[in-house]
Amino acid sequence: MEWYNPLCKYDKVYAAKVFTFTPDYNYYINANQIEKGGTGYDIEKVLPIEVDRLQPDYSIYNIDSNLSYGFLTRGCPNRCKWCVVPKKEGKISPYMDIEEITAGRKKAILMDNNILASNYGLQQIEKIIKLGIKVDFNQGLDARLIT
């Protein structure tokens, strides 16, 4: 796995985008096969669970070596007209354990859509506190649920 280099030939190139309005990469891609995914291409298409839960190879990114990214829950109980999450992921449900995401690292950026709306999410937050992991709840926290 490596970042795409237009000077190289590849067996397979994966391209993804979140939004339909994101412009496509309109240049020649030197690959035998090109796989496009993400909600920007097809809201119905999903990855096999064993692929979706793979953790990134952090060594190819220029980030803090003690940092990890992930989701503890997927889905959302709200049905905001403008949001694709309930349609794509369904109701909120457990997804991964914090220790699977961090794998010994002490910092995490969590991208859950509504972690406080789930008992599992609350249990994971208690575990995060117990393990002393510093967390950035990147998508925010629903203030209506913090009481």
Residues covered by each model-derived region:
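N-terminal pre-triad scaffold of radical SAM enzymes
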Residues: Y58-E89, R105-D112
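Short catalytic/ligand-binding loop motif for oxyanion handling, primarily in non-cytosolic enzymes
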Residues: T22-D24, D42-V46, N78-W82, E89-K91, ...
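Glycine-centered flexibility motif
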Residues: E35-G40, E44-L47, G75, G132-D136, ...
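Glycine-rich beta-alpha loop elements in corrinoid/cobalamin-binding modules
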Residues: M1-Y69
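Core AdoMet radical
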Residues: Y14-V18, V85-T147
